[in-house]
Regions:
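Positively charged, small/polar-rich N-terminal and surface patches that mediate targeting and assembly
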Residues: 1-107
Length: 107
């Protein structure tokens, strides 16, 4: 099993969602709002914490857990949709999941 994490600008969520849903066997995803800190801001010199906190930018994080074969297809689909953007628009990574349990409540 693999976990895919995708961090994108909020405006790109719909485009990524459509590409992922088009993959046969799409298992669903978790989406949450996060803040990113651009690398360039850390190189701009000494700042106060208050100034640094205002430099965070809104992003959306997508998390998907899927079988190895499906995860590769989902990863490739997301890369294809996002690879033509600007630097800093998105980040995608995939890691191994050693064990997972999906709990379902019934009744």
């Amino acid at each position: 099993m693999k976990e895919i994490r995708i961090v994108v600008r909020p405006q790109l969520l719909e485009r990524v969602h459509e590409a992922l849903r088009a993959c046969p066997g799409f298992p669903g995803m978790t989406v949450g709002e996060v803040d990113g800190y651009p690398p360039a801001a850390s190189l701009a010199g000494a700042h106060s914490i208050k100034e640094d906190l205002t430099e965070f930018v809104p992003r959306v994080r997508i998390e998907i857990v899927a079988s190895d074969a499906l995860a590769t297809a989902l990863f490739d689909s997301a890369v294809k949709v996002l690879e033509h953007g600007q630097t800093g628009e998105s980040a995608i990574w995939m890691t191994d999941v050693l064990q997972a349990t999906f709990l379902h409540r019934t009744g």
